[in-house]
UniProtKB/Swiss-Prot annotation:
Stored Pfam families: DsrE
Keyword Chaperone belongs to the record: no
Lineage: Bacteria, Pseudomonadati, Pseudomonadota, Gammaproteobacteria, Enterobacterales
Organism: Serratia proteamaculans (strain 568)
Gene3D superfamilies xrefs: DsrEFH-like
Protein name: Protein TusC
GO biological process: tRNA processing
Subcellular location, record wording: Cytoplasm
Function, in words: Part of a sulfur-relay system required for 2-thiolation of 5-methylaminomethyl-2-thiouridine (mnm(5)s(2)U) at tRNA wobble positions.
Length: 119
């Protein structure tokens, strides 16, 4: 089976990218065990705790990221530079356990995947 990476680059709730990416990730997890999940740029905002999307009449799908380990999705990464740019370096209570890596390290990991899906 191919190694598939899912890259989240957009913030939550402004468009359907994050929700659609999560749906695709969950569907793919039933077919493959070799998945990686990367949060880069505004994508790091997907994992912020305490979001209140109902205030803008949006569906709260963020908590679903927290159940990814139940689907054997365990390789999750946050971009260190993206966190710093957004003043989030000190946040530790993400909705999903993810390893914080420098952009170069993320690039090396991504290069090892056969397919990369970006949302």
């Amino acid at each position: 089976m191919k190694r598939v990476a899912f890259v989240f680059t957009q913030g939550p709730h402004g468009n359907a990218g994050g929700r659609e990416g999560l749906d695709a990730l969950l569907a793919t997890s039933a077919l493959s065990e070799d998945l990686g999940v990367f949060f880069i740029g505004d994508g790091v905002l997907q994992l912020l705790p305490g979001q209140q999307p109902e205030k803008i009449l949006a569906r709260n799908y963020i908590a679903t990221f927290g159940v990814l380990p139940l689907y054997d999705v365990e390789r999750c990464y946050l971009c260190q530079a993206s966190l710093q740019e957004r003043g989030l370096s000190q946040v530790t209570d993400w909705v999903l356990d993810a390893e914080v890596l420098a952009p170069d390290a993320l690039g090396q990991l991504l290069a090892g995947y056969d397919a990369v899906m970006t949302f």
